[in-house]
Amino acid sequence: MRFPFFASFIVFCIWLGYEIHKHRNKQAKVDQEFWQTEAAANNTRRKSLDDLEYIKIPFDSLPMNLLKEDSEIADYHHTLIELSNSPIVNFTGISNTDLKLQYGAPNIELLSRYDQSYTTLVRTLQDWAEVLFEKGYTNEACSILEF
């Protein structure tokens, strides 16, 4: 009775050791590929940013005159006006490594600022639409969110 249990335990330990070893090898390969790609990205020269899809804020299609005396909405307007003076690009879903490979490592700070501007734009539009919705301006809130 003890021998089958002991033998099963030994087989289980050997199998577990094999699986752990296999997982470590697989993870080491993934890590190595990541660092090779990262090294290649860090050595990429600066490339042109002309093909980026810059976002322009369409002030004429946004309800800029609605409740503009409200201080909270005035803050959103001010943020949007400031954002309109800076480049805005949506890099959602694109890793920094991919950005460095495509546009060059020296551009990563600039591209990060463009993406941060996009994040600020989206957050501001969401907050502005929420305030309008709460005040009963459903259609105007929808037009903001549809942008």
Regions found by a protein language model. Give the residues of each.
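N-terminal alpha-helical interaction modules that lie
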Residues: R2-V122
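Residues at structural and domain junctions
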Residues: Y114, D127-W128
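Generic helix N-cap/helix-start motif at coil->alpha-helix transitions
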Residues: T119-Q126, T138-N139
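Residue at a conserved register position within TPR or TPR-like alpha-solenoid repeats
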Residues: V131-L132
